[in-house]
């Protein structure tokens, strides 16, 4: 997370105003950055670490070394295929794929290495795509605020399942193992679904507040931020989901900050 943030800061300084970017996605190894822009294109950039002396970041307790990142000023791919702005983006070295979703209701696949067009998916009702996630197992989920539904596909474009989200989703995150999808939004709950069928595996009740951000920790805990500034921490109580040893009954509101 820190590496991605640092890369974005460096990238932001020299390119954001020029390219008018909407969003970014970074590969798991941090070496490739994909960006979506208002002009309906996706650009793919190489990332490298700055060599030489390390900068140091001051904290309240100590100084920590920080490595900066350099994004090559010219993208090595400019990918086309959409008729409207890019709304969601995924890039993976392991799958050799760049997947982009758009307000035009399409999801377009390109190869990462060659930048070659592979296929397009269209939302079942043509709705603008709001979010997409893809697992390393080759499963893709599309979500639209217009129909409030999740749509599961294989990497080859085969439709597998559809399920209503039962409310507007602000966050969709994969578990570390890639087999489960955590969804949260206006209802204030975290709902965990199978990436094989979209079946609900577990439901975590919140505190009646809209959840605006969600992350899954390496220990497979959920950290959820609410609209009023609260931070909620959940352990994964289902043995099927739990991939690491966690303290029991860790299910509490940790802080409330504005």
How should each PLM-predicted stretch be described?
Residues 50, 73, 115, 157-158, ...:
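Short coil/turn linkers that define WD40 beta-propeller blade boundaries
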Residues 30, 95, 138, 178, ...:
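Conserved loop/turn motif of beta-propeller repeat scaffolds
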Residues 51-67, 74, 203, 208-212, ...:
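Terminal intrinsically disordered, low-complexity extensions flanking WD-repeat/beta-propeller proteins
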Residues 4, 10-16, 54-59, 66-70, ...:
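Short C-terminal beta-strands that terminate individual repeats in beta-propeller domains
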């Amino acid at each position: 997370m820190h590496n991605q943030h640092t890369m974005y800061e460096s990238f932001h300084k020299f390119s954001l105003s020029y390219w008018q970017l909407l969003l970014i996605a970074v590969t798991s190894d941090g070496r490739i950055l994909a960006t979506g822009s208002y002009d309906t294109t996706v650009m793919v950039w190489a990332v490298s670490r700055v060599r030489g002396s390390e900068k140091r970041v001051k904290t309240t307790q100590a100084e920590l070394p920080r490595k900066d990142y350099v994004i090559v000023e010219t993208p090595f791919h400019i990918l086309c295929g959409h008729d409207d702005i890019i709304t969601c983006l995924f890039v993976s070295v392991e799958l050799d794929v760049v997947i982009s979703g758009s307000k035009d209701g399409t999801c377009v696949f390109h190869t990462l290495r060659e930048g070659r067009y592979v296929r397009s998916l269209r939302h079942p009702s043509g709705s603008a795509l709001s979010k997409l996630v893809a697992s390393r197992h080759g499963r893709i989920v599309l979500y639209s605020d217009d129909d409030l539904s999740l749509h599961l596909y294989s990497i080859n474009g085969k439709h597998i399942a559809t399920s209503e989200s039962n409310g507007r989703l602000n966050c969709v995150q994969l578990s570390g193992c890639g087999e489960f999808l955590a969804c949260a939004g206006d209802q204030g709950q975290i709902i965990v679904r199978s990436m094989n069928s979209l079946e609900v595996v577990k439901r975590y009740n919140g505190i009646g507040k809209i959840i605006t951000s969600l992350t899954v920790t390496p220990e497979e805990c959920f950290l959820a931020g609410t609209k009023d500034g609260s931070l909620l921490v959940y352990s994964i109580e289902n043995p099927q989901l739990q991939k690491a040893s966690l303290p029991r009954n860790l299910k509490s509101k940790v802080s409330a900050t504005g």
